[in-house]
Regions:
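Hydrolase catalytic cores
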Residues: 86-89, 108-114, 134, 225-264
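C-terminal subdomain of the subtilisin-like protease fold in secreted/lumenal serine endopeptidases
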Residues: 1-7, 16-19, 26, 138-149, ...
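Carbohydrate-associated surface elements
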Residues: 203
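Active-site core segment of subtilase-fold serine proteases
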Residues: 3-6, 12-106, 123-130, 136-141
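Glycine-centered tight turns that cap/initiate beta-strands
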Residues: 55, 59, 196-199, 227
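Structural detector of well-ordered beta-strand residues that form the stable sheet scaffold
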Residues: 108, 170-172, 199-200, 222, ...
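Substrate-binding/access-modulating region of protease and related hydrolase catalytic domains
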Residues: 112-195, 206-209, 215, 233-248
Length: 264
């Protein structure tokens, strides 16, 4: 199992903006009504996170490393992908840098991929089950799970996803970047191919389907995935492209929807 290939467009040390993808899904409208994902825990199964990033440190609730890279408690990101995904979901609103879709949600970091973006199916399955059964110090439970990764079909992986769904966790996954810019071609990957998942394709700033985005009957929704600004390694920011970047927009949106529903 590997990261779905992505492209680094640029890296910068300073930035202040609400990324266009966050605006696309109209998250700021919910913020104005007081819904920012407070109390909602989102599990991020990826390459880890920059634990000291100023836009993320406030929202990391817990984490664990399931790779061979360091100790169980070392879920630091040595790739950049996981940090970028986490920022799109829940970068803290601190007046600088970027802000995520659900800026008051909490992040449970499950490092299942190493610095090269590789991980075993067993590591990913263990990460899913850890997130499914995790309980916070105040009784918090995971409500949303984000996986911006892909590989071959695996029955045990699907079983773990089914276990998560049975406990009320919504699973958002990337559709994949094997698209050929032909709407008639259908590209399939996994876990995107499982019916239990919300599968996310990518669009650009003009809301046009990205040329690289997988297009299949399993795609449920589309979100920004081209030149997406978010958090990156060493406290920096980066523009990345890929369906990996689209998926966390939906994970964050799900947190807002869940929070809103619980208040009504």
């Amino acid at each position: 199992m590997r990261l779905i290939p992505f492209k680094i467009e640029s890296v910068t040390e300073t930035l202040t903006e609400i990324p266009y993808g966050v605006k696309h899904i109209e998250a700021p409208k919910l913020w104005k009504n007081g819904e920012k994902g407070e109390g909602i825990v989102i599990a991020v199964l990826d390459t880890g996170i920059d634990r000291n990033h100023p836009d993320l440190v406030e929202n990391i609730i817990d984490g664990r490393n399931f790779t061979d890279e360091g100790s169980e408690d070392d879920y630091s990101d040595r790739n950049g992908h996981g940090t970028h995904v986490a920022g799109t979901i829940a970068a803290f609103e601190n007046g600088k840098g970027v802000v995520g879709v659900a800026p008051e949600a909490k992040l449970l970091i499950c490092k299942v991929l190493d610095r090269n973006g590789s991980g075993s199916y067993q590591s990913i399955i263990e990460g899913i089950r850890y997130a499914t059964n995790w309980v916070g110090s105040k009784g918090e439970r995971v409500r949303v799970l984000n996986m911006s990764l892909g590989g071959e079909k695996d029955d045990e992986l699907e079983a773990a996803i089914l276990e998560a769904c049975a406990k009320g966790i919504v699973v958002a996954v990337a559709s994949g970047n094997e698209g050929d810019d032909d709407e008639k071609t259908l590209e399939y990957g996994y876990p995107a191919g499982y019916n239990e998942c919300i599968t996310v394709a990518a669009c650009d700033e003009n809301k046009k389907l990205a040329y690289f985005s997988n297009n299949s009957l399993q795609v449920d929704c589309i979100a920004a995935g081209v030149n997406v600004n978010s958090t990156y390694l060493n406290g920096q920011y980066a523009k990345l492209s890929g369906t990996s970047m689209a998926t966390p927009h939906i994970a964050g949106a799900l947190a807002l929807i869940i929070g809103l529903g619980e208040k009504q």
